[in-house]
Amino acid sequence: MTLSNTIQITPELIAAHGLKPDEYQRILDLIGREPSFTELGIFSAMWNEHCSYKSSKKWLRTLPTKGPRVIQGPGENAGVVDIDDGDCVVFKMESHNHPSYIEPYQGAATGVGGILRDVFTMGARPIAAMNALRFGEPDHPKTRHLVSGVVAGVGGYGNSFGVPTVGGEVEFDARYNGNILVNAFAAGLAKSNAIFLSEAKGVGLPVVYLGAKTGRDGVGGATMASAEFDESIEEKRPTVQVGDPFTEKCLLEACLELMQTGAVIAIQDMGAAGLTCSAVEMGAKGDLGIELDLDKVPVREEQMTAYEMMLSESQERMLMVLQPEKEAVAKAIFVKWGLDFAIVGKTTDDLRFRVIHQGEEVANLPIKDLGDQAPEYDRPWREADKRAALPANLVAAPEDYGQTLLSLVGSANQSSRRWVYEQYDTLIQGNSLQLPGGDAGVVRVEGHPTKALAFSSDVTPRYVEADPFEGGKQAVAECWRNITATGAEPLAATDNLNFGNPEKPEIMGQLVGAIKGIGEACRALDFPIVSGNVSLYNETNGVGILPTPTIAGVGLLPDWQAMARIGSASEGDRIIMIGVDGSHLGSSIYLRDILGSTDGPAPEVDLFAERRNGDFVRSAIRNGQVTACHDISSGGLGLALAEMAMASGKGLNIDLGECKGLSHALLFGEDQARYVIAVPADVADFVCINAESAGVPFRRLGTVEGDALAIDGLLSVSVQQLRQAHESWFPAFMDGSALAAAE
């Protein structure tokens, strides 16, 4: 069989499609001929890192993905976890890094749109969103432009679609100067017996195109997302998709309405690689072939080629395998919502992916080799060198503890993110119980009197760089801890693994180490990974990002009225630290932001202590013994106390007399498995007795009183001063005054 080729397939063209010479040879061996230009594009899209996970698949298989509550693990559009009463939560996190650097508004907006589609494709109504954003250093000339565009894009799409943004992260570091990260998370609610999957079943059934029309936007987007950046980056702007949240809202309602009719056999959103990836995945999963007739595809631009139509990443589109007898019902629903509905193909029994355009066959390929049998690499990797220990007595103590604390709470990475989250609608749908700014976002489960879900997103990239294994463990542990700090039971997680070029053994070593750490922590904490995304080649001119394996998790609150908040302490409450005294200053923000050093190892994560301490805190919260709770993470005990004081507006009188160690390590050490809790005075003794009997280390620290954070003669800073420092950096940065002052 030979397909006509109007474009010569040259080594340069092959390389431009991101295919290595040995991969192209594999294509020749598979199909026994030269591929057509359209086929080359299809292979390029399906065999790149973004779609095939060819560098990471071996290691992803080692992650724990099952558990008593897991209904659907990795391999579908999103993970599904049981939350009792016949309900389930559907969630996933995914990156849109490269597009957001090139075109920040549309890149971020379509990142939100794509993750929302992943959720409602499964039959779930989205109820919460988060985003983890990482930008270059604040004084880099592009950073403010990128922050402004990304935040506007996230808010513009999410707000218009109608989903509350309940949490996330914003971090600045020079290593993201040329390659920002935009990791978008969404969660939705569905009935456990009404989950829709992408696996096609049945021969000769109609393949239906749903949603918006196809244009040229995003052609080659998946291939771009699997490449490094260089000076030609601006030329890649046409590969960024354009989103329309109002069309997506109509698509959501039409899909959920259609799903009630029994018409849907399989459904897949069109994301990376568009029509190509969705059709191949549906067929390959079901051991079926797919035939597409591109003349039936709704288009919004004239004279589109087969190549452009197959690789377009136009947004707000779905592909579905339909019960034939339900065609009229299905079409009526989509017409009602003002959306396209077109039968563009059929399922076949020959395991071929066949594409017809203008009456000619432009692609005829083995579907399994495009999908789940794509190339897989066992890349060489090198373990990171262990950093030398950094005892606290070798780290300089601050001359002025109060000024040091003010500097930390007002720094680029620890200051309030209010400027960001106030641009997001956090209250739409009317179920938000905890908003951004605390440990986790909390959303009430619609239709249930007491049940709620908690959401958190976490990673500490400087730890992962220092020690990928411990950093991977810590990302999971902090997510688990933040969910626990509300009183919720952590159920499951999704991972978004952002790394540099995996062809470099040291970068591949970071990825391998982090996955090993994530796996160990997930197993120890019964916190399985049920969905996720890998984003590699995050490099510009050979400079890689900080390794950033973001972990987003979901927890269940059986009764949200027994929930803890960071800022709900009452006057006279006693402050207790759960966990060991601070001692670890290696890779800390005190070391980085105050002393200008990145030395030292990451803190070790004792997963047994993490589990024991967290279970104790959760139990105390659910028993009504805790009025406020906050996890201790970056900045140590000092920053955690400051954040609690700012959130409540009340002072804290703290005595470190019982603590053992150097004052700066006690305050700023970033030892793990720790919380600060506020408890009523009349139950403080009871809580401490319970902790002692459970083998949980604790320290009585002081009392909620006054209007200042006063620590043991070391510092006394008014809550007003703390808030002023905490709230002022971001607005000043965005209006330019912070940079002007720094100059």
Curated annotation (Swiss-Prot):
Disulfide bonds: none
InterPro entries in the cross-refs: PRibForGlyAmidine_synth_PurL (IPR010074), PurL_linker (IPR041609), PurM-like_C_dom (IPR010918), PurM-like_C_sf (IPR036676), PurM-like_N (IPR016188), PurM-like_N_sf (IPR036921)
Gene Ontology biological process terms, A to Z: 'de novo' IMP biosynthetic process
Keyword S-adenosyl-L-methionine tagged: no
Residue numbers binding ATP: 53, 92, 495, 532
Gene3D superfamilies, per database record: PurM-like C-terminal domain, PurM-like, N-terminal domain
Catalytic activity: N(2)-formyl-N(1)-(5-phospho-beta-D-ribosyl)glycinamide + L-glutamine + ATP + H2O = 2-formamido-N(1)-(5-O-phospho-beta-D-ribosyl)acetamidine + L-glutamate + ADP + phosphate + H(+)
EC number(s) from the headed UniProt entry: 6.3.5.3
Protein name in the entry: Phosphoribosylformylglycinamidine synthase subunit PurL
Species per Swiss-Prot/TrEMBL record: Rhizobium rhizogenes (strain K84 / ATCC BAA-868) (Agrobacterium radiobacter)
Name of the coding gene: purL
